[in-house]
Curated annotation (Swiss-Prot):
Cofactor requirements of the protein: Mg(2+)
Gene: sul1
GO cellular component terms, semicolon-separated: cytosol
Superkingdom field: Bacteria
Residues annotated to bind 4-aminobenzoate: S49, F178, S213
PANTHER family xref list: FOLATE SYNTHESIS PROTEINS (PTHR20941), FOLIC ACID SYNTHESIS PROTEIN FOL1 (PTHR20941:SF1)
Mutagenesis or variant effect for L180K: Fully complements folP deletion mutation in E.coli strain BW25113. Does not adversely impact growth or enzyme expression levels
Residues annotated to bind 6-hydroxymethyl-7,8-dihydropterin: N101, D173, K212
Protein name in UniProt: Dihydropteroate synthase type-1
Task performed by this protein: Catalyzes the condensation of para-aminobenzoate (pABA) with 6-hydroxymethyl-7,8-dihydropterin diphosphate (DHPt-PP) to form 7,8-dihydropteroate (H2Pte), the immediate precursor of folate derivatives. Confers resistance to sulfonamide antibiotics, including sulfamethoxazole (SMX), sulfadiazine and sulfisoxazole. The type II enzyme is stable whereas type I DHPS loses its activity rapidly.
Lineage: Bacteria, Pseudomonadati, Pseudomonadota, Gammaproteobacteria, Enterobacterales
E.C. number(s) listed in UniProt: 2.5.1.15
UniProt: Mg(2+) binding residues: N9
Length: 279
């Protein structure tokens, strides 16, 4: 069963306008609606991470997420905080969120004791840049991508496990779009080889492709028109081993998953009936 992460950005400069919720009341309303229409988890981003994003201090990140965490205090297990800043992460841990999502993949060992004492799940993301936000200068070649991603995760998972973090708390995100390369071919190669990654790593995978640059480069459309391409990529990811999908359109994805699962049941039933006919 796939877990759907709905994207909620508490920023002024996220690359997809419709994901932005700047006022606390609007953010709470949007989060509740996401949970209603199909999100299992709301992934809350207090700072953008695309190449043109402006820096946000930990104090401002905390100021942005605090009202939402107050409002969702009885559903903290369904909240993820998307931040790579240790101060924000420690605050989120103290509030009892269900997930921490780090685009740098938790590089700071000083945070590990706090993580080990908590029980939230960790989305450990790979990026070619290794630190900071996505850039247009990193360039991971398609033919090198899988080996590089596996090497990164083997080292990072080992470090987290040695610090006392249980393996069943770890979720791995290979990174997509500018986090891999400005060239769409790298993301397409990784997306088409999810099964290989999952077999090599042996841990759950999260895939986040929603409205990303490589989709636009592939189909020749702007961000605002990438809903159908995003859904197609997300369904491909689910069919090829993704356990978690992070999306701007959780309601659409949930409907598509429901239909796909229903169709699979009918296909299985029909195959079983044909077997009985030939018995």
């Amino acid at each position: 069963m796939v877990t759907v992460f709905g994207i909620l950005n508490l920023t002024e400069d996220s690359f997809f306008d419709e994901s932005r919720r700047l006022d606390p009341a609007g953010a709470v309303t949007a989060a509740i609606e996401m949970l209603r229409v199909g999100s299992d988890v709301v992934d809350v981003g207090p700072a953008a991470s695309h190449p043109d994003a402006r820096p946000v201090s930990p104090a401002d990140e905390i100021r942005r997420i605090a009202p939402l965490l107050d409002a969702l205090s009885d559903q903290m297990h369904r909240v993820s905080i998307d931040s790579f800043q240790p101060e924000t992460q420690r605050y989120a841990l103290k509030r009892g969120v269900g997930y921490l999502n780090d685009i740098q993949g938790f590089p700071d060992p000083a945070l590990y004791p706090d993580i080990a004492e908590a029980d939230c799940r960790l989305v450990v993301m790979h990026s070619a840049q290794r630190d900071g936000i996505a850039t247009r200068t990193g360039h991971l070649r398609p033919e090198d991508a899988l080996d590089e991603i596996v090497r990164f995760f083997e080292a990072r998972v080992s470090a987290l496990r040695r610090s006392g973090v249980a393996a069943d708390r770890l979720i791995l995100d290979p990174g997509m779009g500018f986090f891999l390369s400005p060239a769409p071919e790298t993301s397409l190669h990784v997306l088409s080889n999810l099964q290989k990654l999952k077999s090599a790593l042996g841990l759950p995978l999260l895939v986040s492709v929603s409205r990303k640059s490589f989709l636009g480069a592939t189909v020749g459309l702007p961000v605002k028109d990438l809903g159908p391409a995003s859904l197609a990529a997300e369904l491909h990811a689910i069919g090829n081993g993704a356990d978690y999908v992070r999306t701007h359109a959780p309601g659409d994805l949930r409907s598509a998953i429901t239909f796909s699962e229903t169709l699979a049941k009918f296909r299985s039933r029909d195959a079983r009936d044909r077997g009985l006919d030939h018995a």
